[in-house]
Amino acid sequence: MSKKTLYFLCTGNSCRSQMAEGWAKKYLNNNEWDVRSAGLEAHGLNPNAVKAMKEAGVDISNQTSDVIDPEILNNADLVVTLCGHAADHCPVTPPHVKREHWGFDDPAKAEGTDEEKWAFFQRVRDEIAERIQRFAETGK
């Protein structure tokens, strides 16, 4: 049986989609799912996303920041956009590709003190983890 492809998309493939990829690789059966992430642009892996995930016991430091690959997009089983910009500007997908939007705040745009910015990253990390755990348990 071939794996199903789950493709997480956001604007820059630096924070939210990277964290989602890391969590999905942790919570989903790797024999059943091929988990990928990409962005409308490739902004590079955000060091705070790596740090936040490491704090939670998930290593995403070897993941790469990539632009959307049309072949992966058009053959994915499920495409999940994680920000409104990606949802609005994501290329059209064929009818057989299921698309969902799971919106999360952008931790890279957090303002305030360093502590407040870090708390923002932690909150978004945990929200993404909860959403992916729910998907792993229910398929929804």
UniProtKB/Swiss-Prot annotation:
One of its GO terms (cellular component) is cytoplasm. It is found in: Cytoplasm. It comes from the Bacteria. One of its GO terms (molecular function) is arsenate reductase (thioredoxin) activity. Keywords: Arsenical resistance, Cytoplasm, Disulfide bond, Oxidoreductase, Redox-active center. InterPro entries: Arsenate_reductase_ArsC, Ptyr_pPase, Ptyr_pPase_sf. Coiled coil: none annotated. It catalyses: arsenate + [thioredoxin]-dithiol + H(+) = arsenite + [thioredoxin]-disulfide + H2O. GO terms for biological process: response to arsenic-containing substance. Its main location: cytoplasm. The keyword Oxidoreductase applies. Disulfide bonds join 10-83, 83-90. It is an enzyme of class 1 (oxidoreductase). Belongs to the low molecular weight phosphotyrosine protein phosphatase family. Thioredoxin-coupled ArsC subfamily. This is Arsenate reductase.
